Amino acid sequence: MTPKIVVPDDYPPALTGSAAEAPLRALGDVQVHGERGAEQEAELVRRIGAAVVVVNIRAYARFTDRVLAACPGLRLISIWGTGTDNVDLDACRARGVAVTNTPGVNAHAVAEHTIALMLAVTRRIPAMDRDTRAGQWPRGLLEQLEGKTLGLLGLGAIGRRVAELARPFGIRLLATTHGPDNGRAAAVGARAVPVETLLRESDIVSLHWRLSAETQGYLNRARLALMKPTAFLVNTARGGLVDRSALIEALREGRLAGAGLDVFHDEPVPAGDPVLALPNVVLTPHNGGMTREVIDAGLLRAVENVERFLRGAPRDVVVAPPRGRAPA
């Protein structure tokens, strides 16, 4: 029997027209939705209700227990990317839905973007570009990275790559891992420290943890207050790691010098969101990993994960398939 495979959220188009599209279509009856709407529960269920396999392209489609309950034939969610915060993993385990992802594929691209945001916000590049185009000639002092302290919250694939890219700038590295360090900090030239020490001593704090029940809102008002008023925050991980109102207040009141943000609580950022009015923030639309190299490699990996699952040899497993159940 040919499995029904649905891509509910290929907007903006990533899979369509890529090198991964033909291999995916060879695996079953494939339906690709190239328009918005997957962020709405009823529409998501309409799209994937009869699916055996879902390939999740965008994190705004949320696979809750209620959604899974409406998809009785679903056997696999293959995620393009590493984040799983849009998937109820416990519900997947309970309902026998396997989950895979593509670890490490976007690590270099997101690490590059992290460094770019550090430079953009510390050097005030967007503001100076805007002022120069307007006929001004801004001459204010800038920050340089050499001699600064960079604190990394998380040393997964992206955090480690950021450390490697940052070292040639002459930056001192601190790191806090979510769990035992096991020598990971030393391996990238960083000093492992408690989070309180990292926040107090860092000139730049960069977030690289996954979003979970434990890390939701981790940088709250009390922890943000530990940072220097001259410090910068960079977030290319997940918006939910930071208490939004506390961050806005700190930036607005000068208790933080600035921030570079690629991720937000609500995506796309709604009109009127106070972060849009902050002059000391550099914003990008959660596209730090959106390079052609990442798209091609990540989508091919996600499709390969579907193929391996269908032949009973799953890889990159986040939630394992139930024993004894046929893949499709």
Residue ranges and their predicted role:
Residues 1-58, 325-328:
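N-terminal glycine-/charge-rich "phosphate-binding" loop or analogous flexible N-terminal tail
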Residues 23, 139-229:
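Rossmann-like dinucleotide/phosphate-binding beta-alpha-beta segment
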Residues 24, 44-47, 67-70, 197-198, ...:
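Structural alpha-helical scaffold elements that stabilize or flank donor/cofactor-binding regions
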Residues 46-53, 72-74, 201-204, 228-231:
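Short acidic/histidine-rich motifs immediately flanking catalytic phosphotransfer sites
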Residues 49-129, 142-143, 148:
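Phosphate/diphosphate ligand-binding glycine-rich loop within oxidoreductases
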Residues 59, 203, 209-211, 237-238, ...:
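Short glycine-/small-residue-rich Rossmann-like dinucleotide-binding loops
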Residues 99, 221, 230-328:
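Rossmann-like dinucleotide-binding domain for NAD(H)/NADP(H)
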Residues 111-130, 148, 164-171, 300-313:
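Oxidoreductase and adenylate-handling cofactor-binding alpha/beta cores
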